[in-house]
Amino acid sequence: MKSRNFFSKLKEESYDVGIFDLMNAKVYLEKDLTYLPEDYKKGYLEDFFTFFPEVLREIKNKTEEEIEDFEINEEEIKKVDSRICSMGSIGASRDSYEKLVKTVINYLIFINKRPLHALTTRFPGGKQIIEKNGNYYCPIKNAQSNELSICEFCICKDLNEL
């Protein structure tokens, strides 16, 4: 699939994510993060619900002509979507969360090629993603690499490579 065609699809999907979806996604994620330490959970939610709506706006404001046109492996898109569908728990607000995450994550991975977390996100141990010389380094890249995560699709390298 051509990147511009995929971007057009994502742009259409971005208009399907409304304020109620954002509210439902927040309710869902708050429940899903119940057992995390409160200070970590609070920061993660703030970063997530600042970053993801910003990326949605970015998608809505970009034109197809601004996107470099290249081939995207459709199997990779299906693999990412499948992983997103398998993440987290089942809940009433899951559909809203999934709609938001699929649109934003696919854009970040395949079109914009940026980290999947905001650069301000604090991970356990207080570490953050670092940008250096146009490369991104993540403190949890290798720790989270498994068949259920989407880390393998992220542009970040492991922090230990820095």
From Swiss-Prot:
On the tree of life, the source organism's domain of life is Archaea
Q: Which family does it belong to?
A: Belongs to the UPF0305 family.
Q: What is this protein called?
A: UPF0305 protein MmarC6_0221
Pfam families in the cross-refs: DUF2115 (PF09888)
Q: Organism source for this protein?
A: Methanococcus maripaludis (strain C6 / ATCC BAA-1332)
